Amino acid sequence: SKNDNYGANIRATLNILPIKGLKWENFVSYDKEQYETREYYTHYYPSLIGTNGQAYIQNYQENDTQYESTLNYSNIFGKHSIQALLGYTYQYTYSTSASMTNSGFDFDDNQTHNIGTGTNLTEGKASMSSNKEDNTYIGFFGRFMYNYDDKYLLSASLRRDGSSRFGDNNKWGWFPAVSVGWRINKE
């Protein structure tokens, strides 16, 4: 088996000076994974006796790209504390795979390097498969948090997410949330 993984992440933050407490953050990520598996079982492999050797090859590759951007605001005015967030996120994943299995080799010498010479291929018994998949996810989100005197708390958030994995008639969805809190021990 052979595995290769590559990845890179970049994060940048920009404090917007004219407005105290406002900052813009960005995150970019790329990840690539690929592997190849080659297996050969000789004529004498105990559970495969009579197959005249069996060869198996599988290749897989996946690329994943992500981007997220947020605008954050945080400030305190006397006993009032406010935090607000607006953001966007994007993710795209693309993968491919292929595999093949064949048996019935005259010799064990070539192993997986001449997989087409096995007799199961000419007899229609060899196994081959391939697959391609790509998925996209996009989200827009916002959150507002209010705190008065560290006693009374309010939080509200709203997301609008779209995904290629959602149902055909529901590619986008709204996801709201609200919470209220009271720290009774602060009274």
Describe these PLM feature segments.
Residues 1, 38-55, 96-127:
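Surface-exposed loop/turn segments flanking beta-strands in extracellular/periplasmic regions
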Residues 4-77, 81, 135-186:
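Surface-exposed extracellular loop regions of Gram-negative outer-membrane beta-barrel proteins
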Residues 90-94:
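Glycine-rich, aromatic-flanked loop segments that form ligand/cofactor-binding clefts
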Residues 131:
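Structured, solvent-exposed acidic/aromatic patches
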